[in-house]
């Protein structure tokens, strides 16, 4: 157990998948959690599960994000942890990638991460404490085939993480990234496998064979690392991009 009682976290994209798992894990460790999602019903559902605070906002809209940060501060008076989890992906050959899909990935994955960080960090600076956790990806380190746009967006997240870590260290704020490998949950597995079949890509069961641990990740694997980065157990860590791929990526 991590000592997160009395702390406040804001999780973007908290209405499902990895974001939901992170919100549940943090709440289970005693943290008060604001669940931000552009899907109002999803945010409210997760908030109800954990006794948290639901916020409806689109991370690509600065005014909405500013209001979300203000609402969180109005409710809890502080933000100790920011988890930039909101993201979108598209899988397929680079030359088949719709321009709209590329733009969406860049807009949400990197611009959204920047916009939310810019809204929250001044409050952390004022208190001279805080932790920011960005969701990157193993694809942000290796550039795997069939993930060109997604990979580009996650390389950018890692770069942003390192730059912010250097700028924020003197203010007592740590900034780190988690780089999951292949994460699959029940809700998304069917959609992923449909795309794999469409382009003749290796199916999930086949890809598992390339993972030394022998399975794909589940959202709670990521949530456990997020809780660690929220805690004082990681007090000497900043600017890190933590591989969480079951050995798929080793560096």
Predicted feature residues:
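Residue(s) in the substrate-gating loop at a strand-loop-helix junction
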Residues: 137
